[in-house]
Amino acid sequence: MGHTPYDDMKKIFLMFAVASLALPMSAARKWNHEQIVEMIQKVNNYWQTNNKPEVRSFWDNAAYHTGNMEVWKMLKDQKMLDYTIRWAEHNDWSGATEANPAKWKYKPYGEGKDHVLFGDWQICFQTYIDLYNIEAAKGNAAASEYMVKRAKEVMHYEAYSEPTDYWWWSDALYMVMPVMTKMYKL
């Protein structure tokens, strides 16, 4: 049997379990800025060393990249940014890839390429917009439009279509609401 999203969840659960065991030992200690940066770099470097970026843009991978972008904003480490760019390029700056809006779905739960309107496939747009904004700040907005083309297409469709229950589960508030707020600046 191949790799499943549940394998990733097991890894994440194990990391949290180990971290929670270490928490009481470190709770009494005051951490300074350098120690926090060192820990962030250590954890993020471990992740990037042990997980290839060429994976799908579904939530189980995309959530990491939203965090990696925040680390990049803080540290400006090009290696971290390059890792996420490789992931975005691997996914052609897209979430679910069905081209025909008449076939787009959001219910019931689904991981298929036709679940374009399902937030688990839209969280990737947060990162694509961040990457686009980095290029736009360099004066490359027009040349970088491909980075947000799919996000604009999908979210415009969602914003102006009739259903009002696209965010029918709580995770969508983390996955999709930031996409909508980031799109405001595009």
What is the predicted function of each stretch?
Residues 1-31:
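Bacterial Sec-dependent N-terminal signal peptides
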Residues 28-186:
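Glycan-recognition and catalytic cores of secretory/periplasmic carbohydrate-active enzymes
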